[in-house]
Amino acid sequence: MLVDNLEALTEQVAAANKGSRSLTIVGGGTKMFLGNPPLENAEEISVRRHCGIVDYHPEELVIRARAGTPIAELKQVLDKEGQILAFDPPDHGGSATLGGVVATGLSGSRRPYGGAVKDFVLGVGMILHDGAYCEFGGQVMKNVAGYDVSRLVCGSFGTLGILADVSLKVLPKPETEITLVFEVSLAEAKKQLEALTRQVSPLSASCFVDGSLKIRLSGGQVSVQSSKSVLGGEEISSDYWNLLDTHSIEPFLGSDEVWRLSTFSEEPFDDDEFAVCDWAFAQRWLINPASNPREGYQGAGHWTRFKGGNHSIDCEAFEPLSSVELALHKRIKKVFDPNGLFNPQRLYRDL
């Protein structure tokens, strides 16, 4: 259902700006655990009722929808046309929204093989600090477009403005898709994934947890079945990947504190150092660590406190910025949100 709530949203923003009131932006509410906690005295503004698909051209592989549109609805519409969101956005039981996925920059299991959210955002419509609605980007992919605002807002956690609508590039749905499981050691899993990565294979997801390597093969029927016959393994449901991406499986269930390390696939680590590794070992997960894992870590990569629970470890959710990086962030924030209206401190406590 197409619902236009833009006027009400712009009026609320303009009034909050005039009254110097901070705003906490919400959609489906499925990602409020990410980032630093919202300010307790901030006024809530919801984009959930600003929803629906505005424009869809299957033949052009482009869809435009309002920020409150459920990801589940988008997937359903695309599936009827044999198309997908290639960055595998986590579904969170049908409550996750398009705006939340783009604002948090949250990609799923296909990320290292298909691309990130920002790679598929063509354009956005945003509500700025004074209540004005502005559009950035467009509805076509340009090789020489440069680094535009539509990419800048991906992963900005709503700190630059409120996403009202988004244009996305979509891709054809693979003809077939299977998930295979192999009971192997960490060393064997690394070796097998390295071999698959070097080959022209239909690999579209990978995960190592508790002595088990899981991979997803996506593509043409002949290619996928040929790879399966060579690799072997036990076949399971491909629903596994959304359960993984939403942390709806062990060992994530019941966890209070979850940390993510984003690093290089080749970065070495010990057998029992991480509970889960996916994205071809480029994304690694720690569960309920006794202390801040950033302290004393000498390897490459960035740590994120992905799920804080009781926030027993008092620190920034995201990797601390250098003084130069923080200064750049502040300059960008000052241009888009000079009065500090949108989601203050959600990304960093100094923003």
What are these regions (language model features)?
Residues 1-25, 47-93, 106-137, 174-184:
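N-terminal glycine-rich flavin-associated loop
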Residues 4, 35, 40, 48, ...:
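Conserved glycine-rich FAD pyrophosphate-binding loop
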Residues 17, 79, 197, 297-299:
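Anion (oxyanion) recognition and catalysis
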Residues 24-25, 204-210, 275-279:
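Short beta-strand
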Residues 26-30:
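Glycine-rich beta-strand-to-loop/alpha-helix junction loops that act as flexible
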Residues 87-88, 94-206:
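FAD-binding subdomain of flavoenzyme oxidoreductases
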Residues 185-188, 217-224, 264-267, 288-293:
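Helix N-cap motif at beta-to-alpha junctions
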Residues 202-257:
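Oxyanion-binding "anion nests"
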